[in-house]
């Protein structure tokens, strides 16, 4: 899975006072008004225009109240913290079908996947035809940031609607989805307008006090940015989390948002003298597992590693705003990517949004493995209910289609740069390549699989510890 960022840099001629200006033009997409993530939230209006908004409960009073209410409402079993909770996906679908037929609502324990906070294993049991995912789990509650998180760890729990989106992307009758992506791109006309705006600035006697005017000039030149989502419906929560993560990562990169952990931003490292004219820095997230281990019979998989890393490359912008990859990346971008990757898990503990993104990667890789090994066919599971939008709707939100650029102004050295960017690119099959997918010859995964028992499950039970 991967998230793409693009930064567009121009070198200026020196100005009279040899003072330079770095205008960081940032674009991104994010989630719909009724859903909030991370440390704040977002809005998408009927025209598809994205806008970020903050939701803060500095006192913690609301969190404590909601935690107390959830503690009283949830049953004792699901509130238990478990290192290894199991969820049978096809049993869960069968139970949901019964509830739907009886006119009953989706229960919280199903909506939030029995409190799973990660997927660490996928198992298939030929005897019972169960397709099982497993991982750590705990009781959950809706916190003041409108994130459903664990009662003990504060980690976001998996959402069934996101899992369904992943399963549909790698379903029993579908071709493997090559990429799940969100891109936020300046238009060609916008890039041409920006080049003209830069030329105007080069012809002027630029002063420090003109920074606000320059920001306005660039914002107007760039215009609205186009948002494109591929691989999943843009009207899903899955898509909204992807693009929201992209948006906030970019804010950190250009210095408009301070991360809750120490991350060296792009502008911390940027040296304008080495940023090539008309260059774009493209950043994107992808799976970061040390190994994806499988059992010798390929009926079990373990995800081992952090889950997410940030990588990138440079592009060049030619006439007419046409972009072409160079296969290279400057030192500032390399430093930012390495720092972000190194601190990702620490960041995810502080900011639920990045843990949400990691969960999407876990779910996508799990779904791709299920499809790759044809567990659907082996289990005789056609995803009949979860795969049907009329029976289990997930396309419920306004689709983000455009966003205005956000501009940051930073003085740096003798040069003038305008980085621009945007995008998300998730490639779960990258985690299933021969260089990362290893056969487990220690027996560890097989042992974990055999430890799962079905004999004591009650009728309709689809999760257990």
Residue spans for each PLM region:
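Domain-wide signal for the mature, well-folded portions of proteins, strongly enriched
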Residues: 1, 30-36
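N-terminal secretory signal peptides that target proteins for export/translocation
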Residues: 1-16
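Intrinsically disordered, low-complexity regions enriched in small/polar residues
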Residues: 9-12, 23, 126
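Bacterial N-terminal signal peptides
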Residues: 17-31
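Outer membrane pore-forming secretion/assembly proteins and partners of Gram-negative envelopes
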Residues: 35-465
């Amino acid at each position: 899975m991967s998230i793409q960022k693009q930064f567009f840099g121009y070198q200026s001629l020196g100005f009279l006072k040899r003072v330079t200006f770095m205008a960081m033009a940032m674009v991104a997409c994010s989630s719909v008004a009724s859903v909030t993530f991370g440390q704040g939230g977002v809005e998408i209006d009927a025209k598809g225009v994205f806008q970020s908004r903050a939701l803060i409960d500095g006192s913690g009073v609301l969190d404590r109240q909601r935690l107390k209410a959830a503690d009283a409402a949830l049953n004792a079993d699901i509130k238990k913290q478990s290192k290894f909770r199991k969820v049978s996906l096809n049993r869960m679908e069968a139970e949901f079908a019964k509830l739907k037929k009886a006119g009953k609502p989706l229960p919280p324990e199903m909506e939030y996947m029995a409190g799973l906070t990660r997927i660490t294993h996928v198992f298939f049991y030929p005897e019972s035809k169960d397709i099982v995912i497993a991982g750590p789990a705990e009781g959950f509650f809706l916190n003041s940031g409108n994130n459903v998180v664990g009662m003990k760890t504060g980690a976001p729990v998996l959402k069934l609607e996101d899992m369904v989106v992943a399963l549909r992307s790698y379903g029993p009758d579908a071709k493997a989805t090559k990429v799940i992506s969100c891109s936020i791109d300046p238009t060609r006309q916008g890039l041409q307008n920006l080049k003209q705006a830069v030329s105007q600035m080069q012809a002027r006697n630029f002063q420090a006090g003109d920074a606000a005017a320059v920001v306005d000039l660039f914002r107007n030149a760039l215009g609205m940015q186009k948002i494109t989502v591929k691989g999943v419906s843009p009207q899903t929560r899955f898509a909204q989390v992807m693009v929201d993560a992209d948006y906030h990562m970019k804010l950190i990169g250009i210095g408009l948002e301070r991360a809750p952990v120490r991350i060296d931003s792009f502008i911390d490292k940027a040296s304008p003298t080495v940023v090539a004219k008309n260059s774009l820095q493209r950043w994107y997230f992808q799976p970061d597992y040390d190994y994806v281990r499988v059992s010798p019979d390929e009926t079990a998989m373990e995800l081992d590693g952090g889950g997410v890393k940030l990588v990138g490359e440079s592009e060049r912008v030619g006439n007419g705003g046409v972009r072409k990859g160079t296969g290279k990346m400057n030192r500032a971008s390399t430093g930012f990517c390495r720092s972000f990757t190194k601190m990702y898990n620490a960041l995810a503990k502080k900011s639920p949004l990045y843990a949400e993104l990691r969960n999407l990667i876990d779910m996508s890789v799990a779904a791709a493995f299920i499809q790759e090994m044809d567990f659907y066919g082996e289990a005789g599971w056609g995803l009949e209910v979860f795969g049907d939008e009329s029976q289990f709707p997930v396309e419920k939100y306004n689709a983000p289609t455009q966003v205005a650029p956000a501009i940051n102004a930073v003085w740096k050295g003798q040069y003038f740069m305008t980085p621009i960017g945007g995008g998300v690119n998730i490639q779960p099959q990258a985690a299933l390549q021969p260089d990362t997918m290893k056969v487990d010859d220690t027996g560890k995964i097989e042992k974990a699989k055999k430890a799962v028992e079905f004999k004591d499950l009650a009728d309709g039970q689809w999760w257990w510890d």
